[in-house]
């Protein structure tokens, strides 16, 4: 990455605290940001990209309503409903309600939207929000540990018309690297009735595991055929078998990059779910973090250094918190052009501060 690139890192004490209340990822945000802080990645230093830590704003009701239904928002933003089971809105089982949910939703959505705003206002070339990346939330329903559709909101924000003497509509590519299919994002932008040969402002590409009985069940998670009535060339999936490794990603990556070059996005959103990494409790893939060809670090570095446009890195899945912390700290180090030995660092902190 060129040294002149600017990196915006979106976080606050309140955001990390509330994100650490997630039933599926308790204390994860605090552990992630403790490690990044301990590595000194927030500190300015010669020879690295400029990084600015930015306190996120809370998303307004209007922000959230660009995608979510009024019924869902009225319920989930009411503090009296925190911790209450409600199957109508998916608040049960793997998306159980919790105390603090009514604050979590606007804080996480606001953080991701703040990241988008730094990119749109040319304040940054790369924006990072590890508490974002919630790709299973539907318009009126929580699902799969996700309660707010910040990924969808980010796409809608970035694709807005850019005013000026020659107004233009930015092109936004969403690349999902989570173990699980980006069902809610893909379904939100899936347009099978698109006229043949027409273009789109958005392109969704999800690389994931898909098999019978594996969450989420979606007809869009498999390979599609152009003869399929539901085919949309701008909503793509690459399903991988159990055991996918660096070699697997290395083989498919030229396809991913060909898609990116052809689409030529102004903005690329990368959902960096860490549950596809070896060591995650799902134990489905055998993907590594390091810099070798096909590894997660290698893929992200390729995006940051050779893909067109600006980039937004979001979090996502990952249920071994130290594993996730190492992954996202390492990806942060790539964004700011710092070489760091994560394998030598212990993970003992459970709190952090910005100094």
What are the residue ranges of the model-derived segments?
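Charged, often glycine-rich, active-site loop that binds/positions anionic groups
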Residues: 56-84
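N-terminal low-complexity, Ser/Thr- and acidic-residue-enriched intrinsically disordered segments
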Residues: 1-66
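Generic alpha-helical secondary structure signal
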Residues: 27-30, 62, 70-71, 99, ...
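A general "terminal functional-core" signal
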Residues: 2-5, 9-10, 16, 75-355
